[in-house]
Amino acid sequence: MRTYLDLLQHILDNGGDKGDRTGTGTRSVFGHQMRFDLSQGFPLLTTKKVHFRSIVIELLWFLKGDTNVQYLKDHKVSIWDEWATAEQTARFGRPEGELGPVYGHQWRNFGATQNSDGSYKNDGFDQIKWLINEIKTNPNSRRLIVSGWNPNEAGQVALPPCHTLFQFFVQDGKLSCQLYQRSADVFLGVPFNIASYALLTHMIAQVCGLGVGDFVWTGGDTHLYANHFEQAQLQLTREPLPLCQLKLNPEITDLFDFKFEDIEIVDYQSHPAIKAPVAV
């Protein structure tokens, strides 16, 4: 994944330093694109170890339409904990652990009616179910889009969706996906996002009877936090290793039937993990 290392170097060399919401400070560029041929290996970063289990559990959580971190906690995944504290959720009148209309809600219940207690009726638009049906019945459509960004609700959550919109494209029996990410934490977040959407593309391709094409990552405000510069420079000293392979249970024909046990990576080699603080 040399293209990812090239992005780190590009930001360090050419980015502009600016303040940010968290008070940490960033070095940022605006508008960047990376392309990964999914037939040539699974794009899980090798220049530092990435916790694939957390990526899988989070994606399954999104697909459930869930917005409470209890499912993540039950599976020992802590990547959303900073935004699920009592202090954070109380800002929006929600109990600890309830994140509100984040990814799962937008994907599976977009535009739902809010109840007086802050919960939502199940009367919104299920974008994922619609997408699967559309890929199967109208694969040449240019409207194979899922949006995680609802302007009416973006201000009702501690962390509005960073990966905001994704589109699929079918050609020659292969499924490709492009993600637009409005805000891209390149050191911590982007490696997860690349792997998550690559995994989603494989899963949807399987249930739609398609092969896989490309995953295209497009970033808006593409940044390194100021307290990640040293870690990025360390990562740039490491040589990429061969990509691993993804194995899915071939018996699964419904996207919502996938469980953790149905998803496996094979021959993952990586350099050691590099720790870095999360900006909240």
UniProtKB/Swiss-Prot annotation:
- The record's top EC class is transferase
One Pfam family here: Thymidylat_synt
The residues listed in the UniProt record as binding dUMP, with positions renumbered to this chain, are R21, R142, R143, R182, S183, A184, D185, N193, H223, L224, Y225
Recorded GO cellular component terms are: cytosol
Q: Where does (6R)-5,10-methylene-5,6,7,8-tetrahydrofolate bind?
A: H51, D185, A279
According to its UniProt record, in which pathway does this protein act? Pyrimidine metabolism; dTTP biosynthesis
Recorded catalytic reaction(s): these are: dUMP + (6R)-5,10-methylene-5,6,7,8-tetrahydrofolate = 7,8-dihydrofolate + dTMP
Give the matching Gene3D superfamilies.
Thymidylate synthase/dCMP hydroxymethylase domain
Compartments, as annotated in UniProt: Cytoplasm
UniProt-listed GO biological process terms? dTMP biosynthetic process; dTTP biosynthetic process; methylation
Q: Which CDD domains match?
A: TS_Pyrimidine_HMase
Q: Which UniProt keywords apply?
A: Cytoplasm, Methyltransferase, Nucleotide biosynthesis, Transferase
Keyword ATP-binding on entry: no
Please state the Enzyme Commission number of this protein: 2.1.1.45
Q: Which residues form the active site?
A: C162 (nucleophile)
**InterPro entries assigned:** Thymidate_synth/dCMP_Mease, Thymidate_synth/dCMP_Mease_dom, Thymidate_synth/dCMP_Mease_sf, Thymidylate_synthase, Thymidylate_synthase_AS
What SUPFAM superfamilies does this protein's entry cite?
A: Thymidylate synthase/dCMP hydroxymethylase
**In UniProt terms, what function does this protein have?**
Catalyzes the reductive methylation of 2'-deoxyuridine-5'-monophosphate (dUMP) to 2'-deoxythymidine-5'-monophosphate (dTMP) while utilizing 5,10-methylenetetrahydrofolate (mTHF) as the methyl donor and reductant in the reaction, yielding dihydrofolate (DHF) as a by-product. This enzymatic reaction provides an intracellular de novo source of dTMP, an essential precursor for DNA biosynthesis.
Q: Which HAMAP family match?
A: Thymidy_synth_bact (MF_00008)
Give the protein family. Belongs to the thymidylate synthase family. Bacterial-type ThyA subfamily.
Q: What's the name of the protein? A: Thymidylate synthase
Q: Which organism does this record belong to? A: Acinetobacter baylyi (strain ATCC 33305 / BD413 / ADP1)
Query: What high-level taxonomic lineage is stated for the organism?
Result: Bacteria, Pseudomonadati, Pseudomonadota, Gammaproteobacteria, Moraxellales
